[in-house]
Swiss-Prot record:
The keyword Ligase does not apply. This is Conotoxin Czon1107. It is found in: Secreted. Inhibits the human alpha-3-beta-4/CHRNA3-CHRNB4 (IC(50)=15.7 uM) and alpha-7/CHRNA7 (IC(50)=77.2 uM) nicotinic acetylcholine receptor (nAChR). Incomplete inhibition of responses is observed for both subtypes, indicating a potential non-competitive mode of action. Changing R3A: Decrease in inhibitory activity on human alpha-3-beta-4 nAChR. Keywords: Acetylcholine receptor inhibiting toxin, Amidation, Disulfide bond, Neurotoxin, Postsynaptic neurotoxin, Secreted, Toxin. Negative results: does not modulate oxytocin (OXTR), vasopressin (AVPR1A and AVPR1B), NMDA (GRIN1 and GRIN2A), and muscarinic (CHRM1 and CHRM3) receptors, and voltage-gated calcium (Cav) and sodium channels (Nav). Exists in two forms, due to cis-trans isomerization at 4-Ser-Pro-5. The conformer with the trans conformation is the most abundant (~65:30). 6-Cys-Pro-7 and the 7-Pro-Pro-8 peptide bonds are in the cis conformation. Expressed by the venom duct. The cysteine framework is C-C. Changing P7A: Gain of selectivity for alpha-7 nAChR. Increase in activity for alpha-7 and important decrease in activity for alpha-3-beta-4. Exists in both cis and trans conformation. Its main location: secreted. It comes from Conus zonatus (Zoned cone). The modification Cysteine amide is found at C10.
Length: 10
């Protein structure tokens, strides 16, 4: 699965 780095991408 892919998780967007947060922050900056939420």
């Amino acid at each position: 699965g892919f998780r967007s780095p947060c922050p900056p991408f939420c």
